[in-house]
């Protein structure tokens, strides 16, 4: 093979190698650009504030962002949530809705409301506080987890059981046991069972369930959870009514 043919072969090989390297570099740059776009999109998406409840279900990969970033658009939205809650509960707000004393709360429930009112007006912090409270709930024996004690119409599985005891004044009071398999729902169950334990059934029946609007919790609850809360309160009041009837007999 003479020198001219050898040079020609080397030249062709050089061109092939150059083209191969060029193709690899183009693909590498394209991959980097796509990865940068994905990272940029992810950063932008994590900063989105979800104003409408329906938008939560549209984002499958970010279910926690709703609790962290959801805030009502304006005062009218917050007010409409309270109106919906009042309509569902069947209870009217007092003449002065901001007056905590008009909701006939037990001392324990009053302290809980004051705790949430002292917190920053942030759905994220308040939802985390509800979840932390749920961890304090006492375990319910399996023998009480029966159909009779189950709260129907809740998104999570919820059980409520009343224990009638005598206090120091020889009066009949109720100690509540509760259970739920949901994080937020378990916190709500704890707030109610702890706040209503140790009181007479007639005092519990006077409690206006709309007190939850004072805490700010109802502003980040979905409609299904609001219904669940009201069903829990309704179950508690049914138990109290039946206990009072048995006491009279």
Curated annotation (Swiss-Prot):
Reported consequences of knocking out the gene: Parasites require mevalonate for survival. No significant effects on apicoplast morphology.
Description of post-translational modifications: Proteolytically cleaved.
Active site residues according to the UniProt entry: 154 (cysteine persulfide intermediate)
Subcellular location: Plastid, Apicoplast
GO cellular component: apicoplast
Pathway info: Cofactor biosynthesis; iron-sulfur cluster biosynthesis
UniProt keyword annotations, A-Z: Apicoplast, Plastid
Signal sequence segment: none
InterPro entries hit by this protein: Fe-S_metab-assoc_dom
Family annotation (PANTHER family): SUFE-LIKE PROTEIN 2, CHLOROPLASTIC, SULFUR ACCEPTOR PROTEIN CSDE
Its biological purpose: Participates in sulfur mobilization (SUF) pathway for iron-sulfur (Fe-S) cluster biogenesis. Enhances cysteine desulfurase activity of SufS. Probably functions as a sulfur acceptor for SufS.
Protein family according to the UniProt entry: Belongs to the SufE family.
Entry protein name: Cysteine desulfuration protein SufE
Lineage start: Eukaryota, Sar, Alveolata, Apicomplexa, Aconoidasida
Gene name of this polypeptide: SufE
């Amino acid at each position: 093979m003479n020198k001219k043919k050898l040079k020609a072969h080397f030249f062709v090989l050089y061109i092939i190698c150059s083209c191969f390297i060029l193709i690899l570099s183009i693909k590498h740059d394209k991959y980097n650009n796509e990865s940068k776009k994905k990272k940029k999109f992810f950063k932008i998406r994590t900063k989105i504030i979800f104003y409408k409840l329906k938008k939560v279900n549209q984002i499958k990969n970010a279910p926690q962002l709703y609790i962290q970033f959801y805030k009502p658009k304006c005062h009218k939205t917050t007010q409409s949530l309270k109106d919906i809650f009042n309509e569902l509960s069947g209870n009217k707000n007092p003449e002065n809705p901001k007056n905590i004393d008009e909701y006939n709360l037990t001392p324990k429930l009053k302290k809980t409301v004051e705790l949430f009112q002292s917190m920053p007006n942030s759905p994220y912090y308040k939802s985390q506080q509800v979840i932390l409270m749920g961890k304090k709930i006492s375990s319910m024996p399996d023998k009480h987890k029966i159909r009779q004690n189950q709260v129907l119409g809740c998104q999570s599985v919820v059980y409520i059981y009343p224990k009638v005891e005598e206090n120091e004044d020889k009066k009949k009071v109720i100690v509540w046991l509760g259970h739920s398999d949901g994080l937020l729902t378990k916190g709500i169950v704890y707030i109610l069972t702890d706040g209503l334990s140790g009181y007479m059934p007639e005092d519990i029946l006077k409690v206006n369930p709309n007190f939850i609007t004072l805490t700010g919790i109802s502003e980040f609850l979905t409609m299904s959870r609001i219904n669940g809360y009201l069903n829990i309160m309704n179950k508690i009041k049914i138990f109290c009514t039946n206990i009072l009837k048995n006491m009279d007999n």
